[in-house]
Amino acid sequence: MAANDTIADMLTRIRNANMARHQTTLVPATKMTRSIAKVLQEEGFIAEISEEGDEVKRNLVIALKYKGKNRQPLITALKRVSKPGLRVYSNRKELPRVLGGIGIAIISTSSGIMTDREARRQNLGGEVLCYVW
């Protein structure tokens, strides 16, 4: 099944795998999904990323992280902000803070995909892709 919004598809797959307490989940590999997964890994929300599949159909294998002996997911929520039908942009002065700094906003800037903190540090604005906390 082809997804028009690959970012929303990725977030939904991660959310569903978290609720079902799966170790890993498969996400279609695109430049955008690779970049978002890399940011999530750098921020400590997911354990590791690897790729599988042939040249035509590559998938990212995302290993999820859990905490405690009840295996509570580290990712409490994933929320898509900018959608294909309604793009949301933010300048450097108005970058959102997610839950007062506890969560992160993933921003697409002219220097690549990064967190809201990194965009603030580099004095950049851009498209607000999603919130993670």
Curated annotation (Swiss-Prot):
Pfam families: Ribosomal_S8. GO terms for biological process: translation. The keyword rRNA-binding applies. Keywords: Ribonucleoprotein, Ribosomal protein, RNA-binding, rRNA-binding. Disulfide bonds: none annotated. The keyword Cell division does not apply. GO terms for molecular function: rRNA binding; structural constituent of ribosome. It comes from the Bacteria. One of its GO terms (cellular component) is ribosome. PROSITE patterns: RIBOSOMAL_S8. Coiled coil: none annotated. One of the primary rRNA binding proteins, it binds directly to 16S rRNA central domain where it helps coordinate assembly of the platform of the 30S subunit. This is Small ribosomal subunit protein uS8. The gene is rpsH.
